[in-house]
C-alpha cells in the first residue's frame, strides 16, 4: 500500500519540479532522503530515568526504537563525562518517513500554539531542513496525562536537493506550511 504523501510526490510534485527547474531526468528531481528525530536529554546525566522516558516517547512518535546517543567528550562545565548517555535519535526512511512527514504536516504542526508557519531560514545551504519543536505534546501519540516533563526535539529533513530553493519547493509541494 503506497502512502498518500508518496503518491502526491510522484503524481504532483515531480511534474511541478521538473517543469520549474527543467530537469532532464526523473532521477534528477529532488526527493526526501531521510528524516532524523533527535531528542537531547541534558538532565539524563543526573537522572537516567529521564532518558528512558524520552526514548519511550520518541519511540511512540516515530514508530521505531530510538538509538541512545552518548557524549563524545567530557565537558566539566556541564558535569558531563565521555560515554555517558545524553540523548536519543531515530532515523526514518521509506514508508515510515512518508507516514511521519504526512502526520507532521497535517496533524502535529497545526497543533502548535500560535502557529504561523515554519521558518524559511532553517535550510542549511545544501537542501536540508531543520525544525525545532518545543514540546512533544503536539504529536497525537503522546498522552498528555502520562507526560512528566515537556521535552523538545529536533527534526531534520534530509533531501537530495542541491540548493535551498529546490528543497523549499519540494517541501512546499509536500504540504510543509512555511511562514509567509
From Swiss-Prot:
Top-level taxon: Bacteria
UniProt cross-references to Pfam families, sorted A to Z: Ribosomal_L5, Ribosomal_L5_C
Any single Gene Ontology cellular-component annotation: ribonucleoprotein complex
Gene3D superfamilies: 3.30.1440.10
GO molecular function, one term: tRNA binding
UniProt GO BP: translation
InterPro entries, alphabetized: Ribosomal_uL5, Ribosomal_uL5_bac-type, Ribosomal_uL5_C, Ribosomal_uL5_CS, Ribosomal_uL5_dom_sf, Ribosomal_uL5_N
Keywords noted in UniProt: Ribonucleoprotein, Ribosomal protein, RNA-binding, rRNA-binding, tRNA-binding
Subunit structure: Part of the 50S ribosomal subunit; part of the 5S rRNA/L5/L18/L25 subcomplex. Contacts the 5S rRNA and the P site tRNA. Forms a bridge to the 30S subunit in the 70S ribosome.
Function: This is one of the proteins that bind and probably mediate the attachment of the 5S RNA into the large ribosomal subunit, where it forms part of the central protuberance. In the 70S ribosome it contacts protein S13 of the 30S subunit (bridge B1b), connecting the 2 subunits; this bridge is implicated in subunit movement. Contacts the P site tRNA; the 5S rRNA and some of its associated proteins might help stabilize positioning of ribosome-bound tRNAs.
PANTHER family found in the cross-reference section: 60S RIBOSOMAL PROTEIN L11-RELATED
Family in the record: Belongs to the universal ribosomal protein uL5 family.
Name recorded for this polypeptide: Large ribosomal subunit protein uL5
Organism: Streptococcus mutans serotype c (strain ATCC 700610 / UA159)
Lineage: Bacteria, Bacillati, Bacillota, Bacilli, Lactobacillales
Amino acid at each position: 500500500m503506497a502512502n498518500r504523501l508518496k503518491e502526491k510526490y510522484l503524481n504532483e510534485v515531480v511534474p511541478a519540479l521538473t517543469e520549474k527547474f527543467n530537469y532532464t531526468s526523473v532521477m534528477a528531481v529532488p526527493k526526501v532522503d531521510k528524516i532524523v528525530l533527535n531528542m537531547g536529554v541534558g538532565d539524563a546525566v543526573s537522572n537516567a530515568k529521564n532518558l528512558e522516558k524520552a526514548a519511550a516517547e520518541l519511540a511512540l512518535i516515530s514508530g521505531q526504537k530510538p538509538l541512545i546517543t552518548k557524549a563524545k567528550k567530557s565537558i566539566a562545565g556541564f558535569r558531563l563525562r565521555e560515554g555517558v548517555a545524553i540523548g536519543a535519535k531515530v532515523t526514518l526512511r521509506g514508508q515510515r518517513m512518508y507516514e511521519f512527514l504526512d502526520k507532521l504536516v497535517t496533524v502535529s504542526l497545526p497543533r502548535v500554539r500560535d502557529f504561523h508557519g515554519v521558518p524559511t531560514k532553517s535550510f542549511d545551504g545544501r537542501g536540508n531542513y531543520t525544525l525545532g519543536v518545543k514540546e512533544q505534546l503536539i504529536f497525537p501519540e503522546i498522552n498528555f496525562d502520562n507526560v512528566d516533563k515537556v521535552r523538545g526535539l529536533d527534526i531534520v529533513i534530509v533531501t537530495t536537493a542541491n540548493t535551498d530553493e529546490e528543497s523549499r519547493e519540494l517541501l512546499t509541494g509536500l504540504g510543509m506550511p512555511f511562514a509567509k
